[in-house]
Every structure is written in C-alpha cells, then in structure tokens.
Amino acid sequence: MKSLNDLPAPKSTTTTYYDHSNDAWFKNRVTESETVKSSSIKFKVVPAYLNRQGLRPKNPEDFGDGGAFPEIHLPQYPLLMGKNKSNKPGAKTLPVTVDAQGNVVFDAIVRQNENSRKIVYSQHKDIIPKFLKNEGDLGTVVDEEEELQKEIQETAEETKAAIEKIVNVRLSAAQPSNIARQSGDSQYIKYKPSQQSSAFNSGAKERIIRMVEMPVDPLDPPKFKHKRVPRASGSPPVPVMHSPPRPVTVKDQQDWKIPPCISNWKNPKGYTIPLDKRLAADGRGLQDVQINDNFAKLSEALYVAEQKAREAVSMRSKVQKEMVMKDKERKEQELRALAQKARSERTGAAMSMPVSSDRGRSESVDPRGDYDNYDQDRGREREREEPQETREEREKRIQREKIREERRRERERERRLDAKDAAMGKKSKITRDRDRDISEKVALGMASTGGKGGGEVMYDQRLFNQDKGMDSGFAADDQYNLYDKGLFTAQPTLSTLYKPKKDNDEEMYGNADEQLDKIKNTERFKPDKAFTGASERVGSKRDRPVEFEKEEEQDPFGLEKWVSDLKKGKKPLDKIGSGGTMRASGGGGSSSRDDDHGGSGRTKINFERSDRR
C-alpha cells in the first residue's frame, strides 16, 4: 500500500473552512439587515396634520408607525416598500460561488448582467479541440477518423438507396403494368414414346423435345378482372346511448305539424285557401309584433286636441246665444215701448215710464218670462180700459187671457222639466230627436230618405270607419260578388210590398187583379217592424213569403236527457273505446252520428275547384 506522500500534488486547492465574516459583501449585508431591523423598531415623533410644513420623510423612522403622507408631494417609501434595492452601493458586490469540484468560480464577473443568458468562454479548455482535450487520447485520433469516414459512407449509401427507391416508384408509375413478362428460358425433355415401331419417328426409341413458354401478345386485353376486396371490419361500432322511449304528447304532435306549402304566386288547381292558412304557411305568426309608443302618444294628443276644440266650440256657441238673447231683449224693449206709446196715444193718457235697465237685465235671463210680464202689463192696462169695452170684446179678451195663461203655465212647466233634465244629465225632446242614431230614426220613420231638403249633402263620419269597403280589403278571398248588399233594400215605398209572380197558382189564390187591388188599398207607410216588447201587432205587409223559425230547444244544456239516461240505467262512460283510434272523447259521444254508429268521426277532406269569373 502506497503512502499518502506518494500521491501527486493537487492542481487546485480550496479552503474548507473559509471565514466569510471578513468579506466586505458579508459585512454590508449584515449591517444592512441590522439597520432595517433597528429602523423598524425605532420611532420618530410625527408632527400634527397641519404642522408638517417643511417635513421631508426619507428614512423609515420619519414615518413613525404609519404610512406615507399624501399632503407631501415627494417620493416616499415607508418601511422601504417599493424602493429599488439595486441602487444601493453594496449591490455591486458579487457573492463567492464554487463549482462541483469545490473551486471558486471567478468567471461570475463576466457572466452577470447582459451576459447571464449567453455562452461565455472564459477558460483555457474552451479553446482546446474536442478530441485533444484529454492528454491520453493522442493515440486514438486515427481510429476516430476511420470510424468517422465509415459512418459517412454508411449514411451516403442509405441516402442513395432511399433516393433510388423514390425514383423507381415514379418511373414504374409511368410504365404500363399489365404487360406480362416473358421468360426466354427453354427446357429440353427426353422421353420414350409408346409407339416403338419403325414406322414412327424413323424407328427411334427416344425423343428429345424443347419446351418453350408460349409467347403472350402484349396488346391482348387482360383475361382476369381484378376485384376490389372490401376492407375487413375493424373494431365493432361504438354503441349509441339512447334515452328510453316515451309516449308522444299532444304538444309534441302540434310542434311537429308542418303546414302545407302554400305559394303566394301560384295556384294552378284553383283551390280556395283561407287567409289564416296562408298566414300560417307564411310564418308571420312567429314574428313578434312591436307597437311603437308614438301611436299611444298620437291618440292621446288627438283626444286632448278634440276636447279643447269641443270646449272652444261650446264656449263660442254660448257667447253667440247670449248675444242673440241680448238682441232679442233689446227688440222686445223697443216693441214694448212702442206698444205703450200706442196705448197712451189711444187713451189720451200720458206715457208711462220706460222700463229701467236693471229690470231689463234681470229679465234677460229668460225671454219667456218677458212675455209673461208683458201679458200681465197688458191685462192691467185692459182693466183700466174696461169701461170702453163692449160685452163681446170683454168675453173674447177674457178667453184670450185664459189661453195666454195656459200657454204661460205650459212654458213654465217645460222650462222646469228642461232644467231638471239638464241637472240629471238627460236631453230635452228637441235635442233627443236631433241626436238620435240613424238606425233609430229609420226604425221610428223619422229619417228623410227622399232627399227633399235639396241642400248640401251631409255625411255621417261614422259610416266611413267601418270594417267593410274597398279600403279595408272589400271582401273575403272566397267571395266573388261585386256588392255586399242590395242597392234598393232600404227604400221604404216599394220594398215593403210583397209582389207575387204573375199567373202563379191562379186557381188556388183566385184572380190576380183582385189581389193586386187589395195590396194597393192597404196602408203603405205603416212600419213593418216594431220595437221588441210592443203591445200592438204590426201590419201584415211583407217583402217576402212567410218564414218559419225553428222552435228553441227547451233543454239547451242536456240536463233532462242526462237525468233520463240515469233513470234508464245508462252510464256516461259506456261508449268509451267503442270508437276508432282517433277518438278520445269521454262521457258519451259528441254528436248524433257518434251516438248511432261507432268508429272514428274523421271524414275525408274534399277540395273543390272555385269558379273563376
């Protein structure tokens, strides 16, 4: 065993026990950590909020135990938060690092900053070739060169073989592949024939033949057809997980119901298709109808404008009535003064005093009250003139006064009734007759259909806001008539008469002339139809033969029939299941046909061709 002294000296030495406390970088770090700890412990008295003029906090102890001061416009770092530590003077000192062999890595100085991500060659071994790095590898340089050349040769051969394979595939694709290859080899076969006589083959006992493969014409079509073999099935198909079957509901059936295709341009068979079916096929019902808010605003504005216009019209009519009343009152005052003057001149007495203006204003409320006062004045004057009257004149005067008094009481009564009706919201007789609807006027016979007025034709605006006419589509699609009503149906003179056909059952009804005379002598202008609930019967004039109405059903809800079925022992659910597959009605059938016959109530739909005009 060799001693340790015989070992060679190491190339590089490292100090195992290295005192790091003497290094400058260690002292700086230790002192910095101590100052930070001491700064976090020491506190400085911070001035009050309004007494911080001139305060410039830079050190951690200037902040006390709090944060930064927002009223001081300086960069502040309480507890050194946010401060860049790379600006410190001790940050440029690099720590000592060692490699795997324990040697100090001095090239850390070169590998810092921008060279930290780069490959830096800082040692002597980095410039030595790879195969000369080790001192004992000088004898193996030649072997490595031979191996390198051998590897290069193998790689070249593999590359050449791959390129030739690709080229041969391209060349064989351009050449025809169905040409059979013909081998030029021939075979010689020696055999003994069965006929050994001298008459065959010159008496030879053995024969030698040359067998050659029969040549193939390259232009012949192929004798065999290549069939494509289907590819074998691989793994079984992936199972599809289905949900369990559930019965189809009515809603699902309605959702799956697809409307028939109805064209808006073609109808070659002339089917009459209702509008609702066209709209269902058009798909307009799927669109949401959005109504603009301006329609409501417009209608409200029109209503307000109409109310204001009505108020203005009523105010103008009221003012006009007052002006007419004042004018009438003035004329009555003048006539009263003239009558007083005439009476005074006739009797020879002095003129009476004129009516004061206050009295005229008080009497201007009601003109009929002025007439009454005028009659009373005349009565008193006639009493003074009694000695000059005869007996007959007096009787006539008294009769006239009675008539005037009766008329005055009638006017007073009408005035009270009108005031009472106005307070209760009722209309007077004249206003009621004037504001009657045209249908009521026609029913009462008050409508003037002859047009005797001869003035300007007045139209009712309500007649233009109807759901019929050319502006509203005129008629349905399945109607081809030009007018919806008859032209002379509302004529009250001729249409009220029922005219029988001439020479129609003359033997049964008698002479036609007598019947016509009887019709002509009847009342023509008596209304044919009266109001409902009238006591008196209407005339027998008709515009058509007698029509009989069906008697109303006494049991519309079927209660008596139900009670009778219960008495007979029938149950309402006896007929369930007796119908077809499409019937699901319970509690008995829904029609008489279902009651009589079982089976489905479904019928065949027949389309009819419409008549084109």
From Swiss-Prot:
Annotated organism of origin: Arabidopsis thaliana
Record region (Disordered): 219-252, 315-437, 513-613
Entry's induction text: Expressed constitutively. Up-regulated by abiotic stress and abscisic acid.
Location in the cell: Nucleus speckle
Record note on quaternary structure: Component of the spliceosome. Interacts with SR45.
Biased composition (Basic and acidic residues): 315-335, 358-437, 515-529, 538-548, 562-574, 592-613
Residue ranges of coiled coil: 135-170, 318-349, 391-421
UniProt family annotation: Belongs to the SNW family.
Any GO CC annotation of this UniProt entry: mitochondrion
SNW: annotated segments: 186-350
Inactivation phenotype: Longer circadian period. Severely dwarfed and infertile when homozygous.
Biased composition regions of type Gly residues, renumbered to the chain: 577-590
Protein keywords: Biological rhythms, Coiled coil, mRNA processing, mRNA splicing, Nucleus, Phosphoprotein, Spliceosome, Transcription, Transcription regulation
Keyword flag Plastid: no
Listed name of the protein: SNW/SKI-interacting protein
Biological role stated in the UniProt entry: Splicing factor involved in post-transcriptional regulation of circadian clock and flowering time genes. Associates with the pre-mRNA of PRR7, PRR9, ELF3 and GI, and is necessary for the regulation of their alternative splicing and mRNA maturation. Probably involved in splice site recognition.
Tissue/organ expression: Expressed in roots, stems, seedlings, siliques, cotyledons, leaves, inflorescences, seeds and shoot apical meristem.
GO biological process: mRNA splicing, via spliceosome; positive regulation of DNA-templated transcription; regulation of circadian rhythm; regulation of photoperiodism, flowering; response to abscisic acid; response to mannitol; response to salt stress; rhythmic process
Entry keyword annotation includes Cell cycle: no
Modified positions (Phosphoserine) in chain numbering: 235, 243
Biased composition (Pro residues): 236-247
One Gene Ontology molecular-function label: pre-mRNA binding
Source domain of life: Eukaryota
